[in-house]
């Protein structure tokens, strides 16, 4: 006997096809209600209703109020997907005046031996830490004068995020080791990438940030 499958098939109508195609052309899996309004030409209420239908059909996952992610078709009928957590962190931080820091930056620079359980982000604006689909996003409030020692890093083949450079990562870790798994983990990371570290830059950063551990 044939059983009814309660999960909806991931079919695309003309409007949803327009949205999906446009976002893919932009290499943009994460999107907001504002994006939907601009792409689909819908009013606010209609855009929200449209996105709700996409979530119900398994085409989109809601990450938080107003923030969504397209589900890759290769996931089949899976309906839960977050995408790359570093890109989610970038969007949560507003896309500017931020950088992935501490333990997350150590992971980006291959200074850890195992994946980090939380994503650490330093941002100028105060942000509340949150959990999305089991991943912790922890925000550290920074000052504008301390927004230096930052570089771009490829999160995927299409999208970059801002990450503290290796020397700034070490200094941040010495200043706040609790966000890196402890001072021992910072020391291990420094040893693992010792050939890439600039002693002169470490001292310069330490002076600017008033971190006496390096001195």
Predicted ranges, named:
Residues 44-46, 113-115, 178-182:
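Short amphipathic alpha-helical segments with coiled-coil-like heptad repeat character
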Residues 86-94, 101-106, 164, 180:
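Positively charged, aromatic-accented nucleic-acid-binding surfaces
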Residues 41, 55, 110, 175-179:
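Hydrophobic/aromatic-lined pockets within catalytic cores
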Residues 2, 151-215:
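Hydrophobic alpha-helical interaction segments
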Residues 98-152:
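Exposed, interaction-prone assembly regions rather than primary DNA-binding/catalytic cores
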Residues 2-97, 132, 194-215:
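Short beta-edge/loop segments at beta->alpha junctions of small alpha/beta modules
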Residues 36, 105, 170:
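A residue-level signal for conserved active-site and pocket-lining positions in enzyme catalytic cores
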């Amino acid at each position: 006997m044939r059983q009814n499958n309660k999960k909806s098939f991931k079919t695309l109508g003309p409007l949803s096809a327009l949205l999906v195609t446009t976002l893919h052309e932009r290499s943009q899996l994460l999107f907001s209600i504002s994006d939907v309004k601009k792409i689909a030409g819908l009013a606010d209420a209609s855009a929200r209703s449209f996105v709700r239908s996409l979530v119900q059909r398994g085409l989109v996952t809601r990450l938080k109020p107003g923030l969504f992610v397209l589900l890759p078709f290769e996931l089949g009928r899976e309906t839960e997907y977050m995408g790359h957590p570093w890109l989610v962190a970038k969007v949560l931080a507003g896309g500017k005046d931020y950088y992935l820091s501490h333990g997350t930056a150590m992971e980006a620079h291959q200074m850890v031996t195992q994946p980090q359980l939380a994503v650490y982000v330093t941002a100028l604006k105060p942000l509340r830490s949150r959990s999305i689909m089991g991943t912790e996003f922890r925000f550290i409030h920074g000052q504008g004068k301390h927004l230096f020692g930052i570089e771009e890093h490829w999160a995927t083949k299409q999208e970059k995020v801002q990450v503290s450079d290796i020397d700034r990562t070490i200094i941040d870790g010495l200043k706040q080791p609790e966000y890196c798994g402890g001072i021992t983990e910072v020391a291990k990371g420094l040893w693992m990438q010792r050939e890439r570290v600039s002693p002169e830059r470490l001292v310069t950063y330490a002076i600017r940030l008033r971190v006496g551990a390096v001195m």
